[in-house]
Amino acid sequence: MRHYEIVFMVHPDQSEQVPGMIERYTGAITEANGKIHRLEDWGRRQLAYPIQDLHKAHYVLMNVEAPAETIEELETAFRFNDAVLRNMVMRTKGAITEASPMAKAKDERDSRRGPAGDRSYDEANAEEIAE
């Protein structure tokens, strides 16, 4: 079996369908005795240029090990799914399991925010002190 990196972009209005799509695609890979080495849901991101008058899309990255026939089935599923705006399947030399630069940047941003989530750590402390 070969290793592949798969990225697909979903229409932003169909973002709620993404978990089901991921489950369906990963299910097809595991049924064919393939392995999922990395799965990252990057969420909605700004596009570099408009696609079908859209400026954002929901991105998903997968690194898998699967038979070529399964990858062909996935590409066909992408082609006939109107919610998938673009997809890219690349063969890689080996399994990539480390976090992508996009995921690392997101983790870094989240760690800088502190335990309060979206608000800064100082704002959360100021509210607690005021109470």
Curated annotation (Swiss-Prot):
The organism's place on the tree of life at top rank: Bacteria
The protein's GO terms of the molecular function aspect are: small ribosomal subunit rRNA binding; structural constituent of ribosome
User: Where do the record's region annotations for Disordered lie?
Assistant: 96-131
Cross-referenced Pfam families: Ribosomal_S6
Q: Its Gene Ontology biological processes?
A: translation
Q: What InterPro entries does this protein map onto?
A: Ribosomal_bS6, Ribosomal_bS6_sf, Ribosomal_S6_plastid/chlpt, Transl_elong_EF1B/ribsomal_bS6
Assigned keywords, A-Z? Ribonucleoprotein, Ribosomal protein, RNA-binding, rRNA-binding
Does this UniProt record's set of keywords contain RNA-binding? yes
Query: Where are the compositionally biased (Basic and acidic residues) regions?
Result: 104-122
Q: Name one GO cellular component term.
A: cytosolic small ribosomal subunit
Q: Which family does it belong to?
A: Belongs to the bacterial ribosomal protein bS6 family.
What does the protein in this record do? Answer: Binds together with bS18 to 16S ribosomal RNA.
Name this polypeptide is given? Small ribosomal subunit protein bS6
Q: Which gene encodes it?
A: rpsF
